[in-house]
Swiss-Prot record:
HAMAP family in the cross-refs: PlsY (MF_01043)
Gene Ontology terms: biological process: phospholipid biosynthetic process
Keywords: Cell membrane, Lipid biosynthesis, Lipid metabolism, Membrane, Phospholipid biosynthesis, Phospholipid metabolism, Transferase, Transmembrane, Transmembrane helix
GO molecular function, one term: acyl-phosphate glycerol-3-phosphate acyltransferase activity
Name of the protein described by the UniProt record: Glycerol-3-phosphate acyltransferase
Pathway(s) where this gene product acts: Lipid metabolism; phospholipid metabolism
InterPro entries: G3P_acylTferase_PlsY
Organism, as annotated: Streptococcus thermophilus (strain ATCC BAA-491 / LMD-9)
Pfam hit, one: G3P_acyltransf
GO cellular component: plasma membrane
Length: 213
């Protein structure tokens, strides 16, 4: 019963669409009607500005971290914290509060890693930041970090200092997270191939922006 309650709490926590509510409450703007129509960090940055975008990213990330830490704080050892964190990701992608139309899982997934394997989170964050600096594309940077996560998982002996050891649950959850992130970025991948992906005002690739209207 405790585990089911934790899963429900994590899912509902993940279902909170931070960018959407910030837009409606403070800007009287529905993110679904502007930019890409997504309620995640990137579109929030683009439509509502840096402050709203930063808050959205931090809150969405902390949803995952909090979900992972809940069973640890409560002393519940019958279930892996990763499983609880995973349901926060599911809530973020398929939120009950907004008709099961949510974000792309990146920030909340990052939060899950932060709560469970902080050094690994820092490593992938550096990969994300470097890729973003080189390409100015958040979508490509997110996909790259996700794929690098899989590669490093497959080559564990080379990065053993980042992880305590092989964990079947961690491996399974990470693989699913990567697949979800790639699936949720299908449209972005198509725009990247056509050189039409939206850029952000950061990094080296700022002169080729051709945003989707």
């Amino acid at each position: 019963m405790k585990i089911l309650l934790l899963i429900l709490i994590a899912y509902l926590l993940g279902s909170i669409q931070t960018g959407l509510w910030i837009g409606k409450v403070f800007f009287h703007t529905n993110l679904r009607e502007h930019g890409s129509g997504n309620t995640g960090t990137t579109n929030t940055f683009r439509v509502l500005g840096k402050t709203a975008g930063t808050i959205t990213f931090l809150v969405d990330m902390l949803k995952g971290t909090l979900a992972v830490l809940l069973p640890i704080w409560l002393g519940i050892t019958e279930v892996s914290p990763l499983i609880i964190g995973f349901f926060a990701i599911i809530g973020h992608v398929f939120p009950f509060f907004t008709g099961f139309k949510g974000g792309k899982a990146v920030a909340t997934s990052a939060g899950v890693l932060l709560g469970f394997v902080p050094l690994y989170f820092v490593f992938l964050l550096l990969v994300f930041a470097l890729t973003l600096y080189l390409t100015s594309m958040i979508s490509f940077s997110s996909i790259t970090a996700a794929v690098v996560g899989l590669i490093t998982l497959a080559t564990f002996p080379a990065i053993h200092f980042l992880l305590d050891g092989y964990d079947p649950i961690f491996s399974a959850v990470l693989i699913i997270i990567v697949l979800v992130i790639i699936f949720r970025h299908t449209e972005n991948i198509a725009r990247i191939r056509n050189h039409r992906e939206n850029l952000v005002p950061f990094g080296l690739n700022l002169t080729k922006q051709n945003p989707k209207k």
